[in-house]
């Protein structure tokens, strides 16, 4: 891990019980997992000049993220990460995200993916945090800007992402990366949705 920038931004990490065995293996122990996941959120916010406020990070399984995806984004399938931005007035940011460790395992197993499940999950936290701080990936130009921010944030935490063929553009959109759920009322850190 590289040294993190000075910040008054906190990142609280909740790891669901189902994720604990895998994360203990990937990160060495749960405390290291919490620390690295928090650092990923803080790094992503810092890339966009947000260094005050809080980001909640919840790591869950596909069975947990599926109904959240259905309720807030009307997508009836599990996904990798969903963001809930609550307030953004840089340098202040408030939001939460939920990410699936099982989707990280599945996506990291793809032959074309050079990332380990640990790195894939850290990328989900970075990606979700970038949605919280205002990034969009629904069209090519914003998607390319988001990809550059992902590369910068991952580098801050010591992970080099592979560049696309054209360094200034993002790879084809990965449909597993979801929009933010900005119309939501939140509550993902408490372990459920209404």
Curated annotation (Swiss-Prot):
<dbReference type="Pfam" id="PF02130">
    <property type="entry name" value="YbeY"/>
</dbReference>
<dbReference type="GO" id="GO:0008270">
    <property type="term" value="F:zinc ion binding"/>
</dbReference>
<keyword id="KW-0690">Ribosome biogenesis</keyword>
<keyword id="KW-0378">Hydrolase</keyword>
<dbReference type="GO" id="GO:0005737">
    <property type="term" value="C:cytoplasm"/>
</dbReference>
<dbReference type="GO" id="GO:0004222">
    <property type="term" value="F:metalloendopeptidase activity"/>
</dbReference>
<keyword id="KW-0479">Metal-binding</keyword>
<dbReference type="GO" id="GO:0006364">
    <property type="term" value="P:rRNA processing"/>
</dbReference>
<dbReference type="InterPro" id="IPR023091">
    <property type="entry name" value="MetalPrtase_cat_dom_sf_prd"/>
</dbReference>
<dbReference type="InterPro" id="IPR002036">
    <property type="entry name" value="YbeY"/>
</dbReference>
<comment type="function">
    <text>Single strand-specific metallo-endoribonuclease involved in late-stage 70S ribosome quality control and in maturation of the 3' terminus of the 16S rRNA.</text>
</comment>
<keyword id="KW-0540">Nuclease</keyword>
<keyword id="KW-0255">Endonuclease</keyword>
<feature type="region of interest" description="Disordered">
    <location>
        <begin position="162"/>
        <end position="194"/>
    </location>
</feature>
<feature type="binding site">
    <location>
        <position position="131"/>
    </location>
    <ligand>
        <name>Zn(2+)</name>
    </ligand>
</feature>
<dbReference type="InterPro" id="IPR020549">
    <property type="entry name" value="YbeY_CS"/>
</dbReference>
<keyword id="KW-0698">rRNA processing</keyword>
<comment type="similarity">
    <text>Belongs to the endoribonuclease YbeY family.</text>
</comment>
<feature type="compositionally biased region" description="Acidic residues">
    <location>
        <begin position="165"/>
        <end position="182"/>
    </location>
</feature>
<feature type="binding site">
    <location>
        <position position="127"/>
    </location>
    <ligand>
        <name>Zn(2+)</name>
    </ligand>
</feature>
<dbReference type="GO" id="GO:0004521">
    <property type="term" value="F:RNA endonuclease activity"/>
</dbReference>
<keyword id="KW-0862">Zinc</keyword>
<keyword id="KW-0963">Cytoplasm</keyword>
<protein>
    <recommendedName>
        <fullName>Endoribonuclease YbeY</fullName>
        <ecNumber>3.1.-.-</ecNumber>
    </recommendedName>
</protein>
<feature type="binding site">
    <location>
        <position position="137"/>
    </location>
    <ligand>
        <name>Zn(2+)</name>
    </ligand>
</feature>
């Amino acid at each position: 891990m590289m040294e993190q920038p000075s910040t008054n931004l906190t990142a609280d990490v909740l790891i669901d019980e189902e994720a604990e065995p895998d994360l203990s293996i990937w990160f060495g122990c749960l405390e290291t997992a919490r620390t690295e996941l928090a650092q990923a959120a803080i790094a992503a916010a810092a890339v966009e000049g947000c260094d005050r406020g809080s980001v909640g990070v919840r790591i869950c399984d596909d069975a947990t993220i599926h109904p959240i995806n259905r309720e807030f984004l009307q997508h009836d399938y599990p996904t990798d990460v969903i963001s809930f931005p609550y307030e953004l007035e840089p340098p202040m940011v408030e939001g939460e995200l939920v990410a699936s460790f099982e989707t990280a395992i599945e996506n990291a197993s793809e032959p074309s993916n050079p990332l380990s499940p640990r790195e894939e999950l850290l990328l989900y936290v970075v990606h979700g945090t970038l949605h919280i701080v205002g990034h969009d990936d629904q069209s090519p130009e914003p998607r390319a800007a988001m990809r550059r921010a992902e590369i910068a944030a991952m580098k801050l935490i010591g992970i080099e992402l592979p560049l696309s063929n054209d360094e200034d553009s993002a790879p084809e959109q990965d449909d597993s990366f979801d929009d933010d759920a900005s119309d939501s009322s939140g509550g993902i850190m408490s372990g459920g949705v209404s």
